[in-house]
Amino acid sequence: MYIKYLKLINFRNYKELDIEFDKNINIFVGDNAQGKTNILESMYYCSIGKSPRTSKDKELINWDNKESYIKVHILKKLFNKKIEIKIFKEGKKGININSIKVSKLSELMGVLNVVMFSPEDLKIIKESPVYRRKFLDIELCKFSKKYYYGLVQYNKVLTARNIILKKWNKGNYIDILQVYDKQLAKYGEVIIKLRNNYLKKLSEKGKVIHSDITSGIENIEFKYMTCLTNFDNIEDDLFKILEFNRKKDIYKGITLYGPHRDDFIVNINGVNVRNFGSQGQQRTSILTMKFASLEIIKEIIGEYPVLLLDDVLSELDKNRQKYILSSIKDIQTFITCTGIDDIKKSIIDEAQLFIVKKGKVSRI
């Protein structure tokens, strides 16, 4: 899979951009705040219909304009695809795939698969469970429509349940709460089961990758942390947990248990890297997660996704840089950097270089 062509109109600092890419390595060089990351952001947006940097689509629209436009041509093993997205200031978006309008975001998922690696990804390791749940949700939605549907339905029911909990003192809603709990347990089972399976696969792929990066010194493992004691009867057990904690939920006015509160831990040699790992170990863990994600997607769809490396080489030591640059020969890769000193000459010789300056891109 690779992106052949990208067109932007009024996207971030680009008034208009038409650009063709090499199917292997593409490097964007330029000072900070010139628009390098914006190009990668537009590709990511075409993958899942959301930005990795903001939850407000209107921020993607160039100043004083009412809409922006993204178009990508994707070449895959079995077919070619063209994605067009219009983003409107009032918060709506229009998506066409091969000139056919699609009404559901789920129809966009999987058309263009990307894995993005940026310095911000350290938050997955270092900060709250929100970032780790978001990582799981995004990765699973890329290839599992079952997960996407289950997640959407679960969140709808969760929102409705929390509304009932907040206004409990104004009436007795026990019957409707019973219905909501059954629905949460049903959709929660889908989420928990697929998350647990994904983390097992991430551990399997990650062990090999992490061992390569650390010369066999470190062993990595990803472990799902949930309110359940086992995964044998997820739906029944989750319903019982919701039922048992109902009074507590009513008192707090919020649902305290379920996959929306789950987490996962990253262990290196049996030690939680979030609490006790060095900065280097935390960075290596993220690198492992990203490259394990690449391998999982390849295993499922039969080809590598597109890899987006946003200003990460300068953040890594020589060994980690070496691992990345030796692992991308079969993967279309987009690299942003302020200079090419951190990139091997052999890579540069094979890559397509672009200079980015004030929203203008020129091919070298």
From Swiss-Prot:
Annotated GO CC locations: cytoplasm
Main location: cytoplasm
Transmembrane regions: none
MF-aspect GO terms: ATP binding; single-stranded DNA binding
Top-level taxonomic group: Bacteria
Entry binding sites for ATP: 30-37
Keyword set includes DNA damage: yes
Keywords, alphabetical: ATP-binding, Cytoplasm, DNA damage, DNA repair, DNA replication, DNA-binding, Nucleotide-binding, SOS response
Database matches in HAMAP family: RecF
Function recorded in the entry: The RecF protein is involved in DNA metabolism; it is required for DNA replication and normal SOS inducibility. RecF binds preferentially to single-stranded, linear DNA. It also seems to bind ATP.
Protein's UniProt name: DNA replication and repair protein RecF
Gene name of this polypeptide: recF
